[in-house]
């Protein structure tokens, strides 16, 4: 099965994303790959589970609000029933760059590598409010159970600024709210100070919201990666307890390898080189 998630922030599209309108074009370059071409053999479903979170809106787009009760869980699996999905509609054709005029999409050969993705464990919890934490939770070796009708806050420190997709796997907790707030530093009275200090400070930044549906092993992952050092996780449960099975990041970025070298007798010059990595 070939399953694709297609998204567009619409009026909240960030400056870094050049887009005409929502669509998907796939072209296979061999007799076998041609099966993947975007023709009427494809089916589509408009997912109503997502809505834009515009708290702390910046020029990097909006954040996500995901209502798990509306999400088509298992859509990417071979045994998923897509009977209610509809046939795609052609809205335009792609053309090679420099050929023709009046086109909507231009197909260009990719000349840079794809972005990498790898597991990035979150480093430590600097502060926890409303719950006692198992010591191995962030290592993926222990679950965290939040009782019904409870409010909990976790202040997570990656210890360095990174770009990653935070991923949270939960079960139960129908109608709960899980809120992610991302920041490079903590704030006090609207001001940043030493990035290592947290006492009397709070996290201000991009906000994702996830509303679990009570199902098992539900995965929340934002549509686009987040940039953060700190994550504040606010959880409010209703009539059901919420089990957090795991919380981690999936680091992403373009490959960046140190192919050159530098050496000299001045230590401060060596430190400048090291800072770049």
Would you name each region that the model predicts?
Residues 1-277:
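Extracellular/oxidizing-compartment recognition motifs
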């Amino acid at each position: 099965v070939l399953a694709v998630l297609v998204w567009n922030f619409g009026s909240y599209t960030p400056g870094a994303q050049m887009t005409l309108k929502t669509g998907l074009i796939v072209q296979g370059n061999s007799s076998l790959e041609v099966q993947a071409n975007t023709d009427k053999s494809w089916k589509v479903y408009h997912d109503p589970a997502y809505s834009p979170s515009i708290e702390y809106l910046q020029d990097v787009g909006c954040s996500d609000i995901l209502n798990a009760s509306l999400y088509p869980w298992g859509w990417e699996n071979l045994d998923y029933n897509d009977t209610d999905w509809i046939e795609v509609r052609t809205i335009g054709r792609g053309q090679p760059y420099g050929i023709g005029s009046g086109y909507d999409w231009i197909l260009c050969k990719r000349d840079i590598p794809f972005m990498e993705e790898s597991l990035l464990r979150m480093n430590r919890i600097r502060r926890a409010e409303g719950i006692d934490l198992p010591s191995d939770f962030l290592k993926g070796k222990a679950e965290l159970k939040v009782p019904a009708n409870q409010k909990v806050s976790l202040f997570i420190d990656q210890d360095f600024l990174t770009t990653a997709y935070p991923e949270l796997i939960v079960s139960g907790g129908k109608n709960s709210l899980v809120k992610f707030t991302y920041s490079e530093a903590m704030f006090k009275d609207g001001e940043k100070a030493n990035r290592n200090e947290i006492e009397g400070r709070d996290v201000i930044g991009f906000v994702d919201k996830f509303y679990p549906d009570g199902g098992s092993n539900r995965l929340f992952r934002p549509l686009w990666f987040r940039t953060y050092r700190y994550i504040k996780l606010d959880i409010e449960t209703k009539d059901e307890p919420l089990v957090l099975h795991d919380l981690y990041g999936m680091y992403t970025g373009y490959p960046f390898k140190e192919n050159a070298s530098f050496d000299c007798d001045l230590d401060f010059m060596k430190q400048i080189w090291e800072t770049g990595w």
